[in-house]
Amino acid sequence: MVKLAKAGKTHGEAKKMAPPPKEVEEDSEDEEMSEDEDDSSGEEEVVIPQKKGKKATTTPAKKVVVSQTKKAAVPTPAKKAAVTPGKKAVATPAKKNITPAKVIPTPGKKGAAQAKALVPTPGKKGAATPAKGAKNGKNAKKEDSDEDEDEEDEDDSDEDEDDEEEDEFEPPIVKGVKPAKAAPAAPASEDEEDDEDEDDEEDDDEEEEDDSEEEVMEITTAKGKKTPAKVVPMKAKSVAEEEDDEEEDEDDEDEDDEEEDDEDDDEEEEEEEPVKAAPGKRKKEMTKQKEAPEAKKQKVEGSEPTTPFNLFIGNLNPNKSVNELKFAISELFAKNDLAVVDVRTGTNRKFGYVDFESAEDLEKALELTGLKVFGNEIKLEKPKGRDSKKVRAARTLLAKNLSFNITEDELKEVFEDAMEIRLVSQDGKSKGIAYIEFKSEADAEKNLEEKQGAEIDGRSVSLYYTGEKGQRQERTGKTSTWSGESKTLVLSNLSYSATKETLEEVFEKATFIKVPQNPHGKPKGYAFIEFASFEDAKEALNSCNKMEIEGRTIRLELQGSNSRSQPSKTLFVKGLSEDTTEETLKESFEGSVRARIVTDRETGSSKGFGFVDFNSEEDAKAAKEAMEDGEIDGNKVTLDWAKPKGEGGFGGRGGGRGGFGGRGGGRGGRGGFGGRGRGGFGGRGGFRGGRGGGGDFKPQGKKTKFE
């Protein structure tokens, strides 16, 4: 290796000085002076190669690393020349540029000052020179392949011409790997043919430099965009390979490695766009994944039940086909005298639904749970889907004002055709509310009309629709038939001595009369009178209202809030606590003249409702608005208009009970300032506010302390 370096010394010096100053040929004999000139020429030539700078961006990669490593060990310029000649190694300009090219990597390894100065220029010419290096060397075949590669690169570079001027330093890293192929063989051929071909090559160099500049610049820019980071390690690897100039196989391996690196770089460039598009693809994939389970759900739930009487059947054998399962399930129920309308199975065939003709068949079918179908014990239960809830709500009634001691059996005696009764309780105590489910919607409507106001355990029950009907009922205030026109009158202030026969004489067109009684068989002071049509009920209301029966003036109202749609001087208050007194009731409506609570004659206990009289309809209206949705003694009361029994007093003062410091407590009460009662100072309740109202305004809500 040392001998080769010496031989390359003399020859390399002559080559370096040859191109610009032809004095190199004359001074080739003196080696020491050429070394000095090489150093000086390297500095001067830095300016010259800048024009060709973009050409060699890629080539110097391997050469640069090798030159530096050898520079540190052997300062002679001979080795610099030996490694650098890529393709144009023989050409003198190539050698001149080679010396600076070696300095390119120096910023990391050697002096930083030289590296900065030479970075743009050296690498650029190094790439251009290799083009001729292979012609004089033994690797003529390699030169041809390199030229082909350059042509291919030129084609690729045409696409990237717009980006030529970007990143001058990055390009050398990628392309510098290829020209090194001919590097080891080039110096050997130069020793034999340099003297003969130098003149010719110099001329050729000058002619081709102009053309090669454009070609190389295009090539380097095309690959210069690629990330240099991956190619850098390959340079270090090439250093070890280039030290052994006699092994051509290693050069071939370098070529393969370089091609792989180039491919990797190309892939990186191509991957930049997909990375941006990836989120979109991922979103599509995510939506597809999300849509999949929904599609399954639709397949399972897609078929609507043919009847409202359906059961869920689980633990089916999924190894059987749909037809086999349907046939087996139908046969099972047919053997038990149950007619099946339809059988629907899920997509996984592990469960399904069975539709029956009637509620009786459904109840009988529930008893068959645990029987085997294709070796599996089936599970039968009522479905809990949204559709079944709507169906059940349509045929279910809500019963209110029930006795707290009422039982399901007692309700069953009243609602004989009820399919299910559910009492609502809290902390083990009944809330006086129950849900009564019937077999059909028609049965529910029939019971609402017939049993509305029925006395159960000493209390008059109030019935309401549930579900969508119940919501409409609340908006319209109708508690009677679904048509909204009540055929029933509610008679209040009835004498306790009055009987059903007495009322039949007064209301001749009545089709049904009910006089509720207490457990002791005594009348409660009110009655329900049903007529054949709404017109008959309305006629009786107009003709018999305020009629005196057995010493008392009766009050008639159409059942439901429609009967009390017109304001009067009297409010009907329902939902009172058993502990509420007339004094408390009157104080709750401060503008009231009088208040009375309906009590049982025998026991003297409250019936849960009462009446409050005012001096005028305006005062009553203001009080009603103030106490709407209000509470009295912890019970939420319901207000409605009633026909006054007597004349009022001296006028009301507005807001309801409560307010700051009132029964409503610190939160404003029901009638105070800002309270739910909407009464009080400036409230809808009117004049001066409720008992607790009108005081200092305290903002509602949580307090925030700042330390």
Curated annotation (Swiss-Prot):
Sequence repeats lie at residues 58-65, 75-82, 83-90, 91-98, 99-104, 105-112, 120-127, 128-135. Its main location: nucleus. Keywords: Acetylation, Cytoplasm, DNA-binding, Isopeptide bond, Methylation, Nucleus, Phosphoprotein, Repeat, RNA-binding, Ubl conjugation. One of its GO terms (biological process) is negative regulation of translation. Coiled coil: none annotated. Some glutamate residues are glycylated by TTLL8. This modification occurs exclusively on glutamate residues and results in a glycine chain on the gamma-carboxyl group. Residues 58-135 are annotated as: 8 X 8 AA tandem repeats of X-T-P-X-K-K-X-X. The modification Phosphoserine is found at residues 28, 34, 40-41, 67, 145, 157, 189, 212, 303, 358, 403, 460, 462, 577, 588, 616. Nucleolin is the major nucleolar protein of growing eukaryotic cells. It is found associated with intranucleolar chromatin and pre-ribosomal particles. It induces chromatin decondensation by binding to histone H1. It is thought to play a role in pre-rRNA transcription and ribosome assembly. May play a role in the process of transcriptional elongation. Binds RNA oligonucleotides with 5'-UUAGGG-3' repeats more tightly than the telomeric single-stranded DNA 5'-TTAGGG-3' repeats. This is Nucleolin. The gene is Ncl.
